[in-house]
């Protein structure tokens, strides 16, 4: 895994962030914000899997059908980590699909707790006090 960020990577990250703003538009009681999360993965998958349509469908549907719910302000952190793992998997086949799913699932709870406590409780009280 390299630490350098290319211009193409910056474009993908920017597009993924913009798509992530639509995440709450696709709320479903069973999978919560999974479809919006899959849309945030789309810019990277479009570039890395453009020549492999079957793998593209499989990867996109995996993200669209797995439960996803976290604090909206912390969501780009989870998306960025999963996007980096998907890039490694698509380009080098060095990351397993189950690893990506388990990392995504294990980051949901802590980021929700941090985001809810900081942005919805502490920050609101501090700003209201000022």
Where are these regions (language model features)?
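Soluble N-terminal domains of membrane-associated systems
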Residues: 1-96
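Transmembrane alpha-helical segments and their cytosolic interface motifs
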Residues: 98-130
């Amino acid at each position: 895994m390299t630490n350098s960020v290319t211009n193409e990577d910056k474009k993908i990250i920017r597009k993924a962030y913009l798509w992530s703003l639509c995440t709450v538009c696709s709320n479903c009681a069973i999978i919560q914000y999974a479809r919006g999360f899959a849309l945030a993965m789309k810019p990277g998958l479009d570039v890395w899997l453009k020549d492999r349509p079957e793998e593209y469908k499989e990867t996109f549907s995996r993200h669209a059908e797995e439960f996803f719910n976290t604090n909206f302000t912390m969501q780009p952190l989870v998306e960025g980590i999963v996007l980096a793992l998907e890039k490694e998997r698509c380009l080098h086949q060095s990351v397993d699909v189950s690893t990506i799913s388990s990392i995504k699932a294990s980051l949901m709870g802590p980021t929700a707790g941090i985001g809810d406590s900081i942005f919805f409780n502490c920050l609101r009280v501090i700003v209201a006090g000022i």
